């Protein structure tokens, strides 16, 4: 993604969807560059998990000062704006 508003992602109800594993890796690495870490795991553990269990139905959000994921229905039911990363 060429332009992404990281401040808006951190402050608003936004979920990000990645269509590919490469897009997922890119998004997560950009999160790290913007000081966004996972809520419950180390960086290496999380990337390893995502590589082994890739799911194109996974959406990411920033909540309670950390990165989390869930299914699309979780976010759409709660009124999140969904942005396509790749």
Model features per residue range: what roles?
Residues 1-86:
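Structural boundary micro-motifs
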């Amino acid at each position: 993604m060429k332009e992404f508003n990281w401040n808006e992602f951190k402050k608003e109800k936004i979920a990000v969807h990645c269509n590919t594993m490469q897009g997922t890796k890119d998004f997560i690495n950009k999160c790290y560059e913007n000081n966004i870490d996972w809520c419950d795991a180390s960086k290496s553990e999380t990337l390893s998990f995502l590589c082994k269990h890739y799911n194109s139905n996974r959406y990411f959000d920033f909540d309670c000062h950390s990165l989390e994921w869930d299914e699309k229905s979780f976010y759409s039911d709660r009124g999140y704006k969904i942005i396509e990363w790749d």
